[in-house]
């Protein structure tokens, strides 16, 4: 059995990691680490685990990391890198769910997140977008799990970028996310009365995920590009729906476009291409799937891509487990074949 330690286990992503790992036939959770809930049983903080998991949250201790084969760091950016360094020095497989190890360009990271204490480790890390960077993930020491918005956007755009089917500076990404994307920490802006029956844009022209999306899209396209990204907050708990627009470099009809996407993602279980309808949040909620729908606007020669994910699963915990499966040479689907709840 693979022994897994989760650092930052009491947040939304940490709890989702625990829930999913309990279903994994090859994993034993060896420790759950949370300074805010230290010495408290998870049965008390999260009663849904009663009779299922009898573990107590612990404060960080290097001995807990030593016991593990894989370490998941579900901590905020800037904080996470300290724990990643400890696990890396111990030779553990490290999967970091913050932004600290997603970038290759230190300048991009520093502009949005500040100084990086261990920039040399960026060369030891891979970007954990499994369907695109699988080979790099296999050989890296650290996996930087992608952000939720970037996962939806990049996978929606990848076939267009790799095949140079769109003008590089024509991309507009309009994304809507559930409130869980903001994390568990109390914030008035995300309280019930502020969010319920409301819908708003935020981080307009300055959201930090823009640089992450641009770096990876530039890599796929083969040259630097700029794009527009605007996130919005939906009055729902979870899920991301991205509507992506770009101008074609040549005319394509919808059937041709669908075939390009189906061929590009031919061997990817977690990518579902819609042919006769469009994705909706309820079809991906609770799953590790990415649902992609396509339309062609002939009068403007633009492609419209709809890309849907569950922000806590494919956008975080599920993709982290998919990365773990890759690192340990397991079938990527292991523990992640889940039908969405729908209602």
Swiss-Prot record:
Q: Which reaction does it catalyse?
A: N-acetyl-L-glutamate 5-semialdehyde + phosphate + NADP(+) = N-acetyl-L-glutamyl 5-phosphate + NADPH + H(+)
* A cellular component annotation (GO) from this entry: cytoplasm
Annotated active site residues, numbered on this chain, are 148
**Similarity comment text for this entry:** Belongs to the NAGSA dehydrogenase family. Type 1 subfamily.
What SUPFAM superfamilies is this protein classified in? Glyceraldehyde-3-phosphate dehydrogenase-like, C-terminal domain, NAD(P)-binding Rossmann-fold domains
The record, for SMART domains, names:
Semialdhyde_dh
Q: What name does this protein carry?
A: N-acetyl-gamma-glutamyl-phosphate reductase
Alphabetically list the UniProt keywords: Amino-acid biosynthesis, Arginine biosynthesis, Cytoplasm, NADP, Oxidoreductase
């Amino acid at each position: 059995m693979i022994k897994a330690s989760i650092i930052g286990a009491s947040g939304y992503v940490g709890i989702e990691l625990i829930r999913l790992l309990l279903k994994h036939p090859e994993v034993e959770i060896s420790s759950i680490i949370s300074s805010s809930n230290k010495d408290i049983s998870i049965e008390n903080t999260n009663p849904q685990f009663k009779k299922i998991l009898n573990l107590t949250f612990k404060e960080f201790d290097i001995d807990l990391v030593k016991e593990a084969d894989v370490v998941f760091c579900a901590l905020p950016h800037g904080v996470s890198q300290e724990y990643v360094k400890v696990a890396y020095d111990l030779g553990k497989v490290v999967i970091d769910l913050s932004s600290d190890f997603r970038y290759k360009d230190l300048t991009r990271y520093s502009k949005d997140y500040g100084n990086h204490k261990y920039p040399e480790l960026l060369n030891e890390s891979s970007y954990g977008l499994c369907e695109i960077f699988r080979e790099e993930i296999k050989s890296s020491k650290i996996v930087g799990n992608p952000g939720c918005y970037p996962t939806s956007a990049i996978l929606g755009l990848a076939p267009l970028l790799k095949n140079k089917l769109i003008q590089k500076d024509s991309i507009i990404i309009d994304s809507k996310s559930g409130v869980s994307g903001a994390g568990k920490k109390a914030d008035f802006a995300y309280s019930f009365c502020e969010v319920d029956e409301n819908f708003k844009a935020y981080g307009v022209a300055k959201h930090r995920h823009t640089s992450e999306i641009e770096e990876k899209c530039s890599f796929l396209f083969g040259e630097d590009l700029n794009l527009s990204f605007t996130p919005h907050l939906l009055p729902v708990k979870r899920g991301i729906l991205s509507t992506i627009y770009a101008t074609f470099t040549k005319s394509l009809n919808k059937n041709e476009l669908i075939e390009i996407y189906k061929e590009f993602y031919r061997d990817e279980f977690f990518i579902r291409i819609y042919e006769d309808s469009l994705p909706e949040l309820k079809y991906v909620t609770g799953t590790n799937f990415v649902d992609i729908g396509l339309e062609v606007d002939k009068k403007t020669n633009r492609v419209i891509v709809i890309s849907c994910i569950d922000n806590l699963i494919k956008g975080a915990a599920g993709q982290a487990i998919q990365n773990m499966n890759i690192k340990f040479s397991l079938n990527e689907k292991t523990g992640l074949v889940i039908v969405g709840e729908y209602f």
